[in-house]
Amino acid sequence: MCRKTKSAIHRRDRCFVEGWRTVVKTKSHYDSPLGGITLIADETALLGLWFDWQPGYADDDSAVLGDSPTIGAAKRWLDEYFAGCIPRTEVPLRLEGTPFRKEAWALLRKVPYGETVSYGGLARRLELKRADGRRVSARAIGGAVHRNPIALIVPCHRVVGADGSLTGYAGGIETKIRLLQLEGVLKQTERTDVDCESIDRIWRSTR
């Protein structure tokens, strides 16, 4: 058991203390068609999801390797997504960042599957949402998108340049192309029809 020392990390037991509450974080891996994905969650929410080769995403050594209900839900979401289905599984998220980044990520989550938005378009949506009318630059939105800690579920791959160009994806442009092909935004040479209902039935039968 971790000693309840405020803000301390007790690495042997792979847990940490937030205030006076002991929090256990779990880390797991997922093999996607595009490569390995790392997931990190605490007892109540998903904290991180990224492709293993993304720069700036170091493993959290306070997390124990394993699975949890939250990570299980995230893996089910990924199964549905990579099968070419619009995911129906709800995954609780906790996005840590500045107030501005949280605003941008909240709007980003509303960009539908199979659609894209420009950095400038996302900036205008945020301006309209704000009561004070403060201007938001496309560059600031780009910074928030680049620092998104939960890829795919918070769909930063759906943000494109003003001219529709595929720019600025932390997972790499080739990955962005593959994701947008999967969603039908970009044409691909071959697509296999998938029975999304069967994916759901398989998950239910293994619970």
Language model features by range: what are they?
Residues 26-33, 85-207:
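Nucleic acid-binding interface residues in structured DNA/RNA-binding domains
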Residues 19-41:
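DNA-contacting interfaces and partner/effector-binding or oligomerization modules
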Residues 5-8, 22:
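Ala/Thr-enriched low-complexity intrinsically disordered regions
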Residues 16, 22-23, 63, 193:
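Detector for intrinsically disordered, low-structure N-terminal pre-sequences
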Residues 41-90:
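Compact structured core domains
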Residues 36, 45-46, 158:
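Structural motif
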Residues 10-13:
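Intrinsic-disorder-associated, low-complexity terminal segments enriched in Asp/Asn/His/Tyr and depleted
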